[in-house]
Amino acid sequence: MQKHRTYETLVDLYQKSAKIHYEIDYRDKKSVKKGNRAAEDMKTIAQLIHLYYPGMLFEFSTLLTNPTYRIDLWAAHHILEIMSYSPMLEDNALSVIERYADENDFTALGNRMWLGQWREKQR
């Protein structure tokens, strides 16, 4: 991933990577590998935004309102795990993760576990 990309290009790649991950076919080894790479790419992109575009955090946080391909969930995790954030942004990101944790799909359990670990670390 090139570090000299514009903020807009990075966010576009982030959203495309979320789509790739969302569309994983777990019966297809190549699809899983591609999806895992997309997840790694999103983490790298979040790190690049944090490093090179820290003034764009508010703009990045608007992804918390985009549930398409679970972009909101990815952004919430990356804001809390990688970026510097305000208490209000922390609350917004946590509410996104809590919403997914309350569902009855395969991502809910992972998000419930993540929230438990997060809360334990915050004590």
Residue ranges and their predicted role:
Residues 61-90:
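Mid-chain, well-packed structural core segment of small domains
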Residues 11, 53-63, 87-98, 123:
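Amphipathic alpha-helical scaffolding segments comprising HEAT/armadillo-like alpha-solenoid repeats
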Residues 12, 77-78, 113, 117:
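Residue-level signature of alpha-solenoid helical repeat scaffolds
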Residues 3-40:
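Short terminal alpha-helical segments
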Residues 67-68, 103-105:
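Short inter-helical turns and helix N-cap capping residues of alpha-solenoid HEAT/ARM repeat scaffolds
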Residues 15, 46, 61-64, 77, ...:
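Amphipathic alpha-helical repeat scaffolds
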Residues 48-52, 82, 118-121:
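Residue-level signature of the C-terminal ends
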Residues 35, 39-42, 72-73, 108:
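Residue-level detector of extended alpha-helical repeat arrays and alpha-solenoid scaffolds
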